[in-house]
Amino acid sequence: TFPHMLHAKILHSDHAHARIVSIDTSEAEKMPGVLATLTGAEVPENSFGPTFQDQPILAYPIVRHRGDGVAAVAAVTEQLATEALEKIKVVYEPLTPVFDPLEAIEDDSPKIHGESNIYTSKIIKKGDVEKALKDSPHVFHRQYRTQMVEHVPLEPQATIASWDGNGRVTIGLVWVVLHLVEKIYLVH
Protein backbone atom coordinates (compact mmCIF):
# COMPACT_ATOMS: atom_id res chain seq x y z
CA THR A 1 0.00 0.00 0.00
CA PHE A 2 0.95 3.63 -0.36
CA PRO A 3 0.51 6.46 2.13
CA HIS A 4 -2.88 8.21 1.71
CA MET A 5 -3.99 5.48 -0.68
CA LEU A 6 -7.57 5.44 -1.95
CA HIS A 7 -9.41 2.22 -2.66
CA ALA A 8 -11.64 2.00 -5.73
CA LYS A 9 -14.41 -0.53 -6.23
CA ILE A 10 -16.70 -1.17 -9.18
CA LEU A 11 -20.44 -1.88 -8.95
CA HIS A 12 -21.30 -4.65 -11.42
CA SER A 13 -24.64 -5.24 -13.12
CA ASP A 14 -26.54 -8.40 -12.29
CA HIS A 15 -28.40 -8.16 -15.63
CA ALA A 16 -27.24 -9.82 -18.85
CA HIS A 17 -28.82 -7.09 -21.00
CA ALA A 18 -30.59 -3.98 -19.76
CA ARG A 19 -31.03 -0.25 -20.22
CA ILE A 20 -29.84 1.87 -17.29
CA VAL A 21 -32.80 4.09 -16.38
CA SER A 22 -31.07 5.88 -13.51
CA ILE A 23 -28.12 5.67 -11.14
CA ASP A 24 -28.31 7.41 -7.76
CA THR A 25 -24.95 7.73 -6.02
CA SER A 26 -26.07 10.40 -3.51
CA GLU A 27 -26.17 8.09 -0.46
CA ALA A 28 -22.66 6.81 -1.19
CA GLU A 29 -21.38 10.36 -1.68
CA LYS A 30 -22.65 11.37 1.79
CA MET A 31 -20.55 8.72 3.53
CA PRO A 32 -17.53 10.11 5.41
CA GLY A 33 -14.38 8.81 3.75
CA VAL A 34 -15.94 8.38 0.30
CA LEU A 35 -14.08 10.85 -1.90
CA ALA A 36 -15.62 10.16 -5.30
CA THR A 37 -18.26 8.29 -7.24
CA LEU A 38 -18.42 7.85 -10.99
CA THR A 39 -20.93 6.53 -13.54
CA GLY A 40 -20.61 5.86 -17.26
CA ALA A 41 -22.64 9.00 -17.99
CA GLU A 42 -19.85 11.04 -16.36
CA VAL A 43 -16.91 9.45 -18.20
CA PRO A 44 -15.72 11.47 -21.22
CA GLU A 45 -14.67 9.27 -24.14
CA ASN A 46 -16.20 6.26 -22.36
CA SER A 47 -14.47 3.54 -24.35
CA PHE A 48 -11.32 1.47 -24.33
CA GLY A 49 -9.97 -1.73 -25.83
CA PRO A 50 -6.73 -3.28 -27.02
CA THR A 51 -7.56 -3.23 -30.76
CA PHE A 52 -10.81 -1.34 -31.18
CA GLN A 53 -11.81 1.13 -28.48
CA ASP A 54 -15.37 -0.23 -28.33
CA GLN A 55 -15.69 -1.37 -24.72
CA PRO A 56 -17.23 1.07 -22.25
CA ILE A 57 -15.14 1.89 -19.20
CA LEU A 58 -18.42 1.96 -17.26
CA ALA A 59 -21.58 0.76 -19.02
CA TYR A 60 -24.02 3.48 -20.03
CA PRO A 61 -26.80 3.56 -21.13
CA ILE A 62 -26.82 -0.17 -22.02
CA VAL A 63 -25.57 -3.11 -19.95
CA ARG A 64 -24.39 -5.83 -22.35
CA HIS A 65 -23.43 -8.62 -19.99
CA ARG A 66 -23.79 -9.69 -16.40
CA GLY A 67 -20.87 -8.15 -14.56
CA ASP A 68 -20.66 -4.97 -16.66
CA GLY A 69 -19.31 -2.18 -14.46
CA VAL A 70 -21.97 0.52 -13.97
CA ALA A 71 -20.51 2.74 -11.22
CA ALA A 72 -17.29 3.23 -9.28
CA VAL A 73 -16.41 4.59 -5.85
CA ALA A 74 -13.13 5.74 -4.28
CA ALA A 75 -12.83 5.68 -0.50
CA VAL A 76 -10.16 5.81 2.20
CA THR A 77 -10.49 2.09 3.02
CA GLU A 78 -11.40 -0.98 1.01
CA GLN A 79 -14.20 -1.83 3.46
CA LEU A 80 -15.70 1.65 3.13
CA ALA A 81 -15.56 1.42 -0.68
CA THR A 82 -17.44 -1.90 -0.49
CA GLU A 83 -20.07 -0.41 1.83
CA ALA A 84 -20.46 2.61 -0.47
CA LEU A 85 -21.24 0.33 -3.42
CA GLU A 86 -24.18 -1.06 -1.44
CA LYS A 87 -25.63 2.47 -1.17
CA ILE A 88 -25.71 3.06 -4.93
CA LYS A 89 -29.18 2.60 -6.42
CA VAL A 90 -29.44 1.54 -10.05
CA VAL A 91 -32.76 1.21 -11.87
CA TYR A 92 -32.66 -1.09 -14.90
CA GLU A 93 -35.10 -1.77 -17.71
CA PRO A 94 -34.36 -5.42 -18.55
CA LEU A 95 -33.87 -6.15 -22.26
CA THR A 96 -33.93 -9.51 -24.00
CA PRO A 97 -30.56 -11.21 -23.53
CA VAL A 98 -28.98 -13.60 -26.04
CA PHE A 99 -27.01 -16.54 -24.66
CA ASP A 100 -26.59 -18.76 -27.72
CA PRO A 101 -23.95 -17.60 -30.24
CA LEU A 102 -25.81 -19.18 -33.17
CA GLU A 103 -29.00 -17.39 -32.13
CA ALA A 104 -27.05 -14.15 -31.72
CA ILE A 105 -26.03 -14.03 -35.41
CA GLU A 106 -29.58 -14.49 -36.72
CA ASP A 107 -31.04 -11.38 -38.39
CA ASP A 108 -34.00 -11.21 -36.00
CA SER A 109 -31.92 -11.67 -32.84
CA PRO A 110 -31.88 -8.78 -30.32
CA LYS A 111 -28.86 -6.60 -31.09
CA ILE A 112 -26.47 -6.41 -28.15
CA HIS A 113 -23.85 -4.23 -29.87
CA GLY A 114 -25.50 -1.64 -32.10
CA GLU A 115 -26.61 -2.87 -35.52
CA SER A 116 -24.99 -6.32 -35.43
CA ASN A 117 -23.87 -8.99 -33.00
CA ILE A 118 -20.99 -9.94 -35.28
CA TYR A 119 -17.78 -8.37 -33.99
CA THR A 120 -15.91 -8.39 -37.28
CA SER A 121 -16.00 -10.29 -40.54
CA LYS A 122 -13.30 -10.99 -43.10
CA ILE A 123 -13.35 -13.15 -46.21
CA ILE A 124 -10.12 -15.04 -46.81
CA LYS A 125 -9.89 -16.94 -50.07
CA LYS A 126 -6.91 -19.02 -51.02
CA GLY A 127 -6.94 -21.63 -53.72
CA ASP A 128 -9.94 -23.15 -55.45
CA VAL A 129 -12.23 -24.43 -52.68
CA GLU A 130 -14.89 -25.78 -55.05
CA LYS A 131 -12.31 -27.77 -57.00
CA ALA A 132 -10.73 -29.11 -53.81
CA LEU A 133 -14.12 -30.30 -52.54
CA LYS A 134 -15.03 -31.84 -55.92
CA ASP A 135 -11.68 -33.65 -56.23
CA SER A 136 -11.58 -34.89 -52.61
CA PRO A 137 -12.23 -38.60 -52.10
CA HIS A 138 -14.18 -37.83 -48.92
CA VAL A 139 -16.09 -34.74 -47.84
CA PHE A 140 -17.67 -34.62 -44.39
CA HIS A 141 -20.41 -32.23 -43.35
CA ARG A 142 -20.78 -32.36 -39.60
CA GLN A 143 -21.30 -30.00 -36.74
CA TYR A 144 -18.97 -30.28 -33.76
CA ARG A 145 -19.44 -28.92 -30.28
CA THR A 146 -17.01 -28.89 -27.42
CA GLN A 147 -17.11 -27.85 -23.81
CA MET A 148 -17.06 -24.21 -22.84
CA VAL A 149 -13.63 -23.01 -21.78
CA GLU A 150 -13.67 -20.54 -18.91
CA HIS A 151 -11.29 -17.62 -18.98
CA VAL A 152 -9.46 -18.13 -15.70
CA PRO A 153 -6.46 -15.83 -15.66
CA LEU A 154 -3.65 -16.19 -13.18
CA GLU A 155 -3.39 -12.44 -12.87
CA PRO A 156 -5.64 -10.70 -10.35
CA GLN A 157 -8.22 -8.14 -11.38
CA ALA A 158 -6.40 -5.37 -9.55
CA THR A 159 -4.25 -2.36 -10.31
CA ILE A 160 -2.37 -0.01 -8.01
CA ALA A 161 -1.35 3.49 -9.08
CA SER A 162 0.68 6.20 -7.37
CA TRP A 163 0.62 9.87 -8.40
CA ASP A 164 3.64 11.92 -7.33
CA GLY A 165 1.90 15.32 -7.53
CA ASN A 166 4.13 16.47 -10.39
CA GLY A 167 2.20 14.85 -13.22
CA ARG A 168 3.85 11.44 -12.98
CA VAL A 169 1.76 8.32 -12.36
CA THR A 170 3.30 4.94 -11.58
CA ILE A 171 0.97 2.02 -12.33
CA GLY A 172 1.50 -1.51 -11.07
CA LEU A 173 -0.50 -4.42 -12.45
CA VAL A 174 -0.18 -7.98 -13.65
CA TRP A 175 -1.33 -8.54 -17.20
CA VAL A 176 -0.21 -10.91 -19.93
CA VAL A 177 -0.27 -8.36 -22.77
CA LEU A 178 1.40 -5.43 -21.04
CA HIS A 179 2.17 -3.44 -24.21
CA LEU A 180 -1.57 -3.24 -24.97
CA VAL A 181 -2.30 -2.00 -21.45
CA GLU A 182 0.38 0.66 -21.87
CA LYS A 183 -1.27 1.78 -25.13
CA ILE A 184 -4.68 2.03 -23.41
CA TYR A 185 -3.33 4.11 -20.52
CA LEU A 186 -1.37 6.41 -22.83
CA VAL A 187 -4.53 7.15 -24.86
CA HIS A 188 -6.48 8.08 -21.74
Positions of the model-derived regions?
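Structural alpha/beta core scaffold segments of enzyme domains
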Residues: 1-188
